[in-house]
Design a protein with these regions (language model features):
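Non-heme Fe(II)-dependent double-stranded beta-helix
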Residues: 1-9, 15-119, 236
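Extracellular structured ligand-interaction cores
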Residues: 12, 88, 126-130, 143, ...
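Short catalytic/ligand-binding loop motif for oxyanion handling, primarily in non-cytosolic enzymes
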Residues: 24-25, 94-95, 100, 140-142, ...
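Non-heme Fe(II)/2-oxoglutarate
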Residues: 41-44, 74, 164-165, 190-192, ...
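Active-site rim elements
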Residues: 58-64, 119, 175-181, 200-202
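Histidine-centered catalytic micro-motifs
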Residues: 104-112, 148, 198-202
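A contiguous catalytic/ligand-binding core that recognizes phosphate-bearing ligands
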Residues: 112-135, 140, 149
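Double-stranded beta-helix
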Residues: 125, 138-200, 222
Length: 239
């Protein structure tokens, strides 16, 4: 199955070792330095719900994971570089042993206010695609794994079509979306997802932190056709 088919069918495509080792190492070293120099325990809720190392977001070591890496060619093939924008990257860390036992992961889609993520209620802050770049190995379940619900992008599409535009002002939907898959990843692996794919991070019962950087990508005219893209999920895509 090629990545086009995997993305359309399952809602995500996994590219093992796609990121050059030099870029992954530079990003990891920058994150480690920032944690050592700037970590503030009083900001832990912000780190967990928005981003670790906020001062590092948008910096060359982080942005190079997207802009100087092969994933950018895939984004271009899928959406067209001239048609999209992107954010400064979210530095996401699941600390080792952050939970005492394995618990089933709970899905979400981005862009809904949680009271902790800095978003205002009454609107969906959707985007178009998500790129995850993994900087530490994730070799078994419940190790902070990026977790997906394959095919759930179509379930959410059907939900929005049935619910109608009032869903734009409502809390995050929670339809039945099937079984979760916890992805195992090596350093430099990349996962490219449709925005509407249900996903989360599993708890980390492993001995090492899980470090990843996520980039949100959006069609430049998304604000004008946000509802259209929620109910016709391949609108604007080239694949």
């Amino acid at each position: 199955m090629n990545w086009h088919t995997q993305l359309r069918t399952h809602g995500y495509a996994h590219f093992p070792g796609l990121t050059p080792a030099s870029l992954a190492l530079a990003a990891r070293e920058a994150i480690d330095r920032d944690l050592r120099d700037n970590y503030d325990s009083e900001r832990q809720l912000e780190y967990d719900n928005q981003s670790y190392c906020p001062g590092l977001r948008g910096s060359p070591p982080i942005m190079d994971l997207l802009l100087r890496a092969p994933i950018m060619k895939i984004v271009d093939e899928a959406l067209g570089i001239g048609s999209v924008g992107w954010d400064k990257g979210q530095i996401a860390i699941r600390r080792s042993r952050n939970f005492p036992r394995e618990i089933p992961p709970e899905p979400h889609i981005d862009g809904f206010a949680s009271g902790l993520n800095g978003l205002e209620e009454g609107k969906i802050y959707s985007h178009t695609a998500l790129v995850g770049v993994f900087l530490t190995p994730v070799l078994r379940p419940f190790a902070g794994n990026f977790t997906v619900w394959p095919g759930s992008h179509y379930v959410y599409e059907s939900y929005f079509r049935a619910r109608g535009a009032r869903a734009m002002r409502e809390p995050m939907p929670a339809p039945e979306i099937g079984q979760a898959v916890q992805l195992t990843c090596g350093v430099g692996d990349v996962v490219f997802c449709h925005y509407l794919l249900g996903h989360t991070a599993a708890v980390n019962t492993a001995e090492i932190d899980r470090v990843a950087v996520y980039f949100r990508i959006w069609l430049r005219d998304l604000e004008e056709r946000r509802w259209e893209c929620l109910t016709n999920i391949w609108e604007g895509w080239k694949i």
